[in-house]
Regions:
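Long, contiguous interaction/recruitment modules in multidomain scaffold/adaptor proteins
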Residues: 1-11
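Short edge beta-strands and adjacent turn/loop segments
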Residues: 180-202
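Helical scaffold of the NTase/Pol beta-like nucleotidyltransferase catalytic core
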Residues: 151-183
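Acidic, proline/glycine-rich low-complexity IDRs
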Residues: 1, 44-45, 223-224
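N-terminal low-complexity, intrinsically disordered segments
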Residues: 130-164, 195-196
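A short interface-forming secondary-structure element
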Residues: 202-215
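Short, non-transmembrane amphipathic alpha-helical segments
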Residues: 214-224
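Alpha-helical protein-protein interaction scaffolds
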Residues: 11-12, 18-141
Length: 224
């Protein structure tokens, strides 16, 4: 049986997942080890993407945004994919959406990267791209269960005449409001969206690791 070598990308991905799963309980050694592995990854854009994801994973949002800002797109379509992923990790949803929407749908299909693009479109509230991709790749039936909540969310926005970029801006404002509870604390925040059971309310979810006594202050920050 042949054993394939583990690439630097795979090693970094595994280490990043360990840090994310630790809920802030990672060691300085773990952090430095990831830094060292990223340095071995070929390609400037790929390096910057991984640095961005690392700093976002540990709640160092300013540094994550700084790393994302240094991404050069001279490498073409693949670089735009990576830039979108990096900006998404840094909670820069508008920038992430801009880059993922710059990749032609035909190129996404040719690269067999529709799954990656769909996840980025979903995470950055880029519903027009999501619907276009699902139609172009004939993937609507296969992905309906996974992306059904997003499609219902998009349908509700359309019915009320709410542009998707307004939603992105709103979510970014919410993330900025709660940043004191995770930025610099080794924690990361995740967003999601769906509709209620009777499809009368569009719901944006923000998953933030926090202590029970912090809940009240977080709710006040979100509502102000």
């Amino acid at each position: 049986m042949a054993i394939s070598a583990v690439t630097n990308d795979q090693a970094v991905g595994r280490m990043l997942n360990e840090i994310l799963d630790s809920n802030g309980n990672y060691t300085e050694f773990q952090f430095r080890r990831v830094i060292g592995e990223i340095a071995k990854v070929p390609g400037h854009v790929r390096k910057q993407m991984l640095y961005t994801m690392l700093y976002a994973a540990v709640g160092e949002l300013r540094e994550a945004k700084n790393q994302a800002a240094h991404i050069s797109l001279s490498e073409g379509t693949a670089a735009e994919f990576l830039a979108a992923a990096a900006y998404h990790a840094a909670n820069m949803l508008t920038e992430a959406s801009r880059y993922i929407r710059r990749v032609p749908v035909e190129a996404i299909v040719a690269l067999e990267a529709s799954g990656f693009a769909l996840l980025n479109a979903q995470g950055t509230f880029s519903f027009e791209l999501m619907e276009l991709l699902m139609n172009k790749t004939n993937a609507h039936a296969g992905n309906k269960e996974q992306f059904g909540g997003s499609l219902a969310f998009a349908k509700m926005l359309k019915s009320h005449g709410i542009p998707e970029d307004h939603v992105r801006s709103y979510v970014e404002e919410c993330l900025a409001a709660v940043s004191p509870w995770y930025e610099g604390k080794g924690k990361s925040v995740v967003t999601g969206h769906t509709v209620d059971d009777v499809e009368k309310k569009a719901i944006v979810d923000i998953y933030l690791p926090a202590e029970p006594e912090e809940f009240g202050d977080i709710m006040v920050a979100l509502s102000s």
